[in-house]
A protein has these predicted regions:
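Low-complexity, intrinsically disordered terminal/linker segments enriched in charged
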Residues: 151-192
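Juxtamembrane/interface motifs at transmembrane-helix termini
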Residues: 65-70, 101-107, 169-171
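Short beta-strand edge/turn micro-motifs at domain boundaries
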Residues: 133-161
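Short loop or secondary-structure boundary microenvironments that flank
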Residues: 40, 114, 153-156
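Surface-exposed, charged secondary-structure patches
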Residues: 94-134, 186-192
Length: 192
């Protein structure tokens, strides 16, 4: 009886481990997204599903942290960091949900994941839409047993680097609290 329990636990553990392939994680989310994009118009329920897909796919806390210089991040107390992460997530999620046509693809080919240790991976996807290729690179981390992207590089343009440059410019003239207000207003604008 004890052996059967051990074998069952081992099988479940192996299945869970096998399910955590970073390429498979991206393919699954991409398939859901492509299904939603094929619809000519999306109702509010489907728009919310897109936002939930983004929440499930991205590590917004790490993306937010990497969107600031190490010094700017460390200079903030935990409450300010949390508020920044929450508003940043809202802004990125809302603006990404509005610009989804960029991710529409007739076909997609995924390269094998490039692993860095057991908890970091890079997955490159080649998307073709109407004969034009776009290359997306997902920089990923294993978070609570799930692969999540913390940066998306589209045709050599890094999301994290782009935000870092923008926020660095803003913080030259404004306080961190003012940066959070700017991000919050942008999130409100894109929510409509």
């Amino acid at each position: 009886m004890f052996k059967k329990i051990l074998v069952t636990i081992a099988c479940v553990s192996l299945m869970a481990f096998a399910a955590e392939d970073p390429v498979a994680a991206i393919q699954k989310k991409d398939a859901e997204l492509q299904t939603l994009l094929k619809k000519s118009s999306r109702n509010s329920k489907e728009a919310e599903r897109v936002k939930n897909l983004l929440n499930d796919s991205f590590d917004f806390a790490l993306l937010a942290k990497k969107s600031l210089s190490a010094n700017d991040w460390k200079a903030q107390d935990a409450a300010s960091q949390d508020k920044f992460v929450n508003e940043f997530q809202r802004m990125v999620r809302n603006s990404s949900a509005k610009r989804l046509e960029l991710y529409r693809a007739d076909s997609t080919i995924y390269e094998p994941a490039k692993m860095k240790g057991d908890n970091e991976a890079r997955v490159v996807a080649h998307l073709w839409n109407k004969g034009k290729e776009s290359v997306l690179e997902y920089k990923m981390s294993l978070v609570d047993g799930k692969w999540k992207a913390w940066d998306l590089v589209i045709d050599d343009l890094s999301t994290a680097r782009n935000y870092k440059e923008q926020f660095s410019q803003i913080l030259k003239n404004k306080s961190f609290a003012e940066l959070i207000d700017i991000i919050s207003k942008k999130a409100d604008e894109t929510e409509k």
